[in-house]
UniProtKB/Swiss-Prot annotation:
Important for the export of protein containing nuclear export signal (NES) out of the nucleus. One of its GO terms (cellular component) is nuclear pore. It comes from Encephalitozoon cuniculi (strain GB-M1). Residues 70-210 form the RanBD1 domain. This is Ran-specific GTPase-activating protein 1. It is found in: Cytoplasm; Nucleus. The keyword Ubl conjugation does not apply.
C-alpha cells in the first residue's frame, strides 16, 4: 500500500514539473544561462561560473570528439565529507526536514533522491546564499549549489508544501553531470517550513543578484 501511495505522489510531481523544466530549458537554449553557450555553430569560451559548487569534473573529451564520463564515486563522497568540515562557519538561514526529488535524464521523470535536512546558508567565503540538502544516515549531500538569481522557486501545484526550482551547477550526483540544468522538487512536512523556505529562497536570490552585480562592477 505504501508503494502505491509513493508512486501516486511521484506521478503528481512529474505531471506538474515537466512544463516548468521545458520553460527553463527554453530560456537556457536562448543563451541566458550561466555556463556554456553556442554561437554560429561553434562553441564560445565563457568565464567560469561563480556558481560552481565543487571541483568534480563534468566530462572528459575522448577521441573523435566523443565525451566520456570522468567520475570517481569515491572522490565525490570524499569531497562531500570535506564540504561538511569546511563550511561549518556558514550562517544557517533556514533548516527543515524534507523529501527531495530531481529530474532524471535517464528516465525522463522525477525521481526521489532522499529524505533529509534542507538548509539555506550564507557561504562565508563567497558571501553568496546557497542550498544544501543532507541525506539521512549515509552522510552525503542530496543537493549543493548557490541560488541562481535567474531561477525563481515556484510552489508545486500538485504537491502539498512543495517547491520547485532549477540550478545550472549542482554536481553532487553523477546523474547531474550529464546535463547542464537540473530541476529539483522539495516537499516539506509542515506549511510553516514551506512558507519559510520560499521566503528565504527569495531573499537569497535577491542577495546573490546584488552581490554578483557588485563583483562584476569591481572588475
Amino acid at each position: 500500500m505504501a508503494e502505491v501511495e509513493r508512486k501516486e505522489e511521484q506521478a503528481k510531481i512529474e505531471s506538474g514539473s515537466n512544463e516548468q523544466k521545458e520553460r527553463g530549458l527554453d530560456g537556457v537554449n536562448k543563451g541566458d544561462a550561466v555556463g556554456d553557450g553556442k554561437e554560429g555553430g561553434e562553441a564560445k569560451k565563457v568565464q567560469q561560473s561563480p556558481f560552481l559548487t565543487n571541483a568534480v569534473p563534468r566530462k572528459d573529451e575522448g577521441k573523435g570528439g566523443e565525451e566520456r564520463d570522468n567520475i570517481d564515486a569515491a572522490e565525490v563522497v570524499e569531497k562531500q565529507r570535506k564540504h561538511l568540515e569546511e563550511n561549518q562557519s556558514d550562517e544557517i538561514l533556514f533548516k527543515a526536514r524534507c523529501k527531495l526529488y530531481y529530474f532524471s535524464e535517464e528516465t525522463k521523470a522525477l525521481e526521489e533522491r532522499a529524505e533529509g535536512t534542507m538548509i539555506i546558508e550564507m557561504h562565508s567565503k563567497s558571501n553568496l546564499a546557497k542550498i544544501t540538502m543532507f541525506r539521512d544516515q549515509i552522510g552525503r549531500l542530496g543537493c549543493n549549489h548557490f541560488i541562481n538569481p535567474r531561477f525563481k522557486a515556484q510552489p508545486h501545484g500538485k504537491v502539498s508544501n512543495g517547491w520547485m526550482w532549477m540550478s545550472t551547477e549542482d554536481t553532487v550526483e553523477t546523474d547531474a553531470l550529464r546535463k547542464k540544468i537540473q530541476l529539483f522538487v522539495v516537499k516539506f512536512y509542515s506549511e510553516e517550513d514551506f512558507k519559510r523556505f520560499g521566503e528565504e529562497y527569495d531573499l537569497g536570490r535577491a542577495h546573490n543578484e546584488k552581490a554578483l552585480k557588485t563583483k562584476t562592477n569591481k572588475k
